[in-house]
Amino acid sequence: FDFTSDKKVKEGFIKVTSETLFNDEQGYGYDLQPAWDGKSNQPFFFSVNVPDGNYKVTVTLGSKDSAGNTTVRAESRRLFIENLPTKKGEMITESFTVNKRNMKISEREKVKIKAREKNKLNWDDKLTLEFNGDAPRITSLAIERADKVPTIFLCGNSTVVDYDNEPWAAWGQMFPRWFTDQVAIANYAESGESANTFIGKHQIGRA
């Protein structure tokens, strides 16, 4: 995906404008909040419909027109890039691997989630990226399957869970920040969970 204002688009990329809004038919676009206009310092979300699995995400952050400071999270606020500064005209490319899942285990079985989990980004059919920070700036985004990387599974309670809303946070959603794109972190933790409830809700089966 090409987020620049350049008229020429690199081969293999899709041009993104402020009118590129997510819908299921298109399968990608700005989501959840107003679209980014390329200049605003407001946070924004970009979603892509992809099957379950691990995905290598490569972002080029920065802008030819202004300095930036960008934080990148995925799904339910899993932290991957924290406060990355870029000077005017500077571009920095970073890669990380995101685990994407939904509730489906098989044709006859799915994970049992609590009512409060139903709207969590962790359990929908999209891979959603959040661009935040003092001045989020992005030039390009590439997403590709990463089937061969190992996956670290996290199970736990409210001290580990991916919290959707600030200012709440737990160590599990900060964990990906410390790993390269050669490993995926799949956080299945949820508030109030124990070993017995993980088995009863089929969380272990989904993992």
Name each model-derived stretch.
Residues 133-136, 144-206:
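Conserved SGNH/GDSL esterase-like catalytic core that processes O-acyl groups on lipids
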